[in-house]
Every structure is written in structure tokens, then in C-alpha cells.
């Protein structure tokens, strides 16, 4: 799926054994999970910044924007990635959980996720 990003960027969708994984890659608020797949078991979503920076010149989703889009598309499990270095992963997680309505994880170096 073509990402919402000034530089052409693809967000891959992988389906294995009936389970669907979607990675938004670098993507802005125009990303729509429904364009990637009708049912998503695990989404790894760009969440570079917090909602305080929405609407600015940063071409990436906030934690809240990623969560709202995932919630609206019925994504079963949401993992945030591409956080700005030095930012607080727990602040991103908390903001996303408030919008998503369920648990959200943050991908940190060395993390692995099983679908």
C-alpha cells in the first residue's frame, strides 16, 4: 500500500497462515489501514510524535492518529514504531491506548512479536 509520505514509500502487507501483518512504514495521517487489508491481526504503525504536534510539518502520524486509524479499521493488535529519538515511549503508548480503547505496545530495539 502506498504510504502518505512526501517520498514514495510502501507499507507492506504480509499474510501467512491466515494471519495478516501490516507495516505502515513512514506514513502521515492520510494512511488508511482499510486500504491495506480488510482484517489486520497485527499492525506496526508509524507514531513519530504526540498529538501536540499534529497538523505541523512532520509527515508522520502521531500516536493518537495511528491509534484512531487502527481502531476505526478494527485492527486486532497495535504496535507503535518510529518514535522520535529521545521521546518517551510510555507517553506514546498512553496516548495511543486512550484513542485505541485497548492495549497498545511500543516496538523497542530487540522486540519481537508473534501473530
Which functions belong to the PLM regions below?
Residues 1-35, 109-115:
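Core dinuclear metal-dependent hydrolase active-site scaffold
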Residues 29-112:
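Cap/insert and terminal regions of metallo-dependent hydrolase folds
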